[in-house]
Amino acid sequence: CTSTSTTIHTSLRLFRTFGGRRGSLRGHDREVWRSPGSTATFPSMADIYTIAAFYEFATLSNLEAYQRSLRALCERAQLRGTILLAPEGVNGTVAGPSAGIEELLVHLRALPGCQRLSPKFSTATAPPFHRMKVRIKHEIVTIGDAEIDPTSRVGEYVTPEDWNALIDDPETLVIDTRNDYEVRVGTFKGAINPNIETFRDFPAWVQQHLDPAEHRRVAMFCTGGIRCEKATSLLLREGFESVHHLQGGILNYLQRVPETESTWSGECFVFDQRVALDHDLQPGTHSLCFGCQEPLSPQDRAHPDYEASVCCPRCASSTTPEMRAQRRERARQVALAAQRGERHVGR
């Protein structure tokens, strides 16, 4: 536990605190589990929230038992966020008091095959999550192909310090494995955008656009490392031989590579209420459209079709007068709740 505490506090010194942002999490904010009789309270707005993002591919069974123990621990430790359990491992992002995060990580590392689980830490001055969800799924990151097994074979990890040299090589094909709306917010210079709506679309894109005989060296990346790691397992199965992925993902790169040496362009979309982070891992300039949940740049918000809490240039044409009226009323209720120092129940 002492080593975990040291890791958290060392990591937190690398981050400046940031405020939360309002917005749903694009299909990731469905209710999964909530303690029905909970009396625990999340830390006050004056507190600093520790955020831990983590994943580990490992062969797990007895998922229901792990779910119960994690539910109890997170309730007791006043944690909120999402933890996914599947036969292939664990994946999650959780926020709360640093002591509770320490306890959770000790518990997670006790799971079979998860001893090397290495979280990425950040902090916040406002809660990035409003619920705690512990969910059992078929996959911890959904690609839709049961034959892909990252627990048995994945590509070669590339450290952030070695990443630039790899992707600057003209013989390397660099692929962004994230969804199209994430790529739009920011990506590495020269990276290919598969233009996929979800990670489930990635295998079909590989079949249509990649060839092991032509693309002899492939380097892939994603936000925190989980999608590109699973993608390497797919490519190795398809006969690609030299397959690489960015260790710890974009967030690890932004933390460890100085901006003066960086080949990253734009901001990094994240699946919480911060929406996007800049190179210093501070909240960026993007927000989410309440209507379509697409990320919005300052230019999007300056467009005549944009109306705060109602619609944006991408969804304005499909937003009916009735929908506009409902969203305006909701925005009014949210503002009134904020004036009373309360959180609107719909947020």
Show where each model-derived region lies.
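Leucine-biased recognition of intrinsically disordered, low-complexity hydrophobic segments
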Residues: 12-14, 25
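Rhodanese-like catalytic fold shared by cysteine-dependent sulfurtransferases
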Residues: 46-154, 179-218, 226-347
